[in-house]
Structures are given as structure tokens and as C-alpha cells.
Amino acid sequence: MTKVRKAIIPAAGLGTRFLPATKALAKEMLPIVDKPTIQFIVEEALKSGIEEILVVTGKAKRSIEDHFDSNFELEYNLQAKGKNELLKLVDETTAINLHFIRQSHPRGLGDAVLQAKAFVGNEPFVVMLGDDLMDITNASAKPLTKQLMEDYDKTHASTIAVMKVPHEDVSSYGVIAPQGKAVKGLYSVDTFVEKPQPEDAPSDLAIIGRYLLTPEIFDILERQTPGAGNEVQLTDAIDTLNKTQRVFAREFKGNRYDVGDKFGFMKTSIDYALEHPQVKEDLKNYIIKLGKALEKSKVPTHSK
């Protein structure tokens, strides 16, 4: 059996929800306190045992490459001033086996994954989406990517991460139609449906941003016609793959943080900061103070 060694991180999106900040800065470089969102993804991959990572980028994404490259001037300056802890943080982002390829035009997630065909070769691989951060406030939690890799060791089949979402939100996700109940958190799947309307959704089990796929997916993606949004949808290709070989779904029970919109990004930043040793106490005190002020502002005033 071939070991899962490689991961793909699609990062070619335009990040329009975060304009004007993302006009010249990659959305994936927006920080949660002091760490870019893409670094959380890379760290999850490494903790899971991934050996090589390909980042699929687009225009205005050079900052991602720079972040994971050496910065001699900065490193020399930190070393000269004896700032060894900061130097260690910088070194952690450069000692990684990262590759980059550019998607010329954003044609959907399926097309972004297809750019990695030569990199992956004939091996199983993981796709990790940057909008979904998993268990970032729980250092002891088993990474979701690692869970998928362990499933593959047992089934030798593609496995997609899913999570229950409110029924009214299913139209924002790919959704699975499970075959019966899960066995130790693993579902057999009848069909995969991209962004169904709530009345048409086969379940509330939504696909979240972790996929373990066999290389046969590339042949399907090459023939895949555009789907929802006139883009090449990875969910559609997975549904086709499921017709010729088993595809399972792993239900995630941890904490998922959606940093793909402003409010989700803010919530993630607050939760992470409340566990950050340098700011958590000050932030807790500020939130308590702010909460009291907000409660006070709700008290109606009466003129005499």
C-alpha cells in the first residue's frame, strides 16, 4: 500500500470578501493574532506526517512564498540581538518542504486540484482548504488530516471530512447522502451533492475542507464539465469517483473555525487569542469590561 505523503493547499482565490485588505495581500496571509491562516494549515499537515506540500497560488500571492522562504536580514538581526525565541519562530516557517504552482485563472476548486497532477503522480494525497481551521485551540487534539490518513490505512479508499451543520446552511456546502449509520465515525456514501437547497439536501452532513483522495480523481477532473457557479467542482468529481470505487466520509467532532468570512475570522481570532499566552489575560479582562458596558447600554433611560 502506498503511504500518504503529499498535501495540496489551494490558495488561488481572490479573497474578495476581505477587500480592500486582500487587494495586494494574499487572504491566506491574514493573521489570527500573530500567525497567518495558511501556517495553521501547514502545521496541521506536518503534525499529521505529511512530507511534501504543494501550494496552488494565483496573482498577488507572492507573500505566501516569501513567508515560507528564508529572510537572511531578519534572521541575522534576531540572532545578533539574542532574540532566540523569535528566531525559532522564524526558522519554523522555513524548514518545510514546500512547492508552489500558479493557477492562471480561478476556475474552481476542482481545477485548482488538477494543477497538482504532476506533483502527486500515482499516489494518494490530501487536499486542505485554507478557510477551515481545525482544533487550533486544542494542541492535544488529533489533527483531522491525521484521522483521514488513518482511515486510508484501513480502507485504502478516498475519505472526505464532513460535519453536521444547521439545515438552513446546507446550500453553502457540498453535502453527502450517507448509506445508513456511521461505523466508528465513518460513513459509506451514496451520493455527493454540491450546494443543494435545504429542501433538496439529502442530509445535514456537510463537506468541510479536508479530503483524502486517490489519484484516479485526476482523470475525472480532466473530463469534468463546469458545475455550480460555472466552475469545475471537486464535489462533482468525487461523486463520479464514488461510482467506480468506494469513497467514505469521516465525521469530524472537533472545533472547526471558518475564516472565509469577516465574522468567522473575528470569532476565530478571539477564541485563539483567549488561549494565547501573551494576550489571553488582557483580552479576558477587556471582554469582561466590554460586556459590562454593553449590558449597561441596554438599560432603558426614562426622562423625568
Swiss-Prot record:
<dbReference type="GO" id="GO:0006011">
    <property type="term" value="P:UDP-alpha-D-glucose metabolic process"/>
</dbReference>
<dbReference type="GO" id="GO:0003983">
    <property type="term" value="F:UTP:glucose-1-phosphate uridylyltransferase activity"/>
</dbReference>
<dbReference type="InterPro" id="IPR005835">
    <property type="entry name" value="NTP_transferase_dom"/>
</dbReference>
<dbReference type="GO" id="GO:0009058">
    <property type="term" value="P:biosynthetic process"/>
</dbReference>
<keyword id="KW-0808">Transferase</keyword>
<comment type="pathway">
    <text>Carbohydrate metabolism; nucleotide-sugar metabolism.</text>
</comment>
<dbReference type="InterPro" id="IPR005771">
    <property type="entry name" value="GalU_uridylyltTrfase_bac/arc"/>
</dbReference>
<dbReference type="InterPro" id="IPR029044">
    <property type="entry name" value="Nucleotide-diphossugar_trans"/>
</dbReference>
<comment type="similarity">
    <text>Belongs to the UDPGP type 2 family.</text>
</comment>
<protein>
    <recommendedName>
        <fullName>UTP--glucose-1-phosphate uridylyltransferase</fullName>
        <ecNumber>2.7.7.9</ecNumber>
    </recommendedName>
</protein>
<keyword id="KW-0548">Nucleotidyltransferase</keyword>
<dbReference type="Pfam" id="PF00483">
    <property type="entry name" value="NTP_transferase"/>
</dbReference>
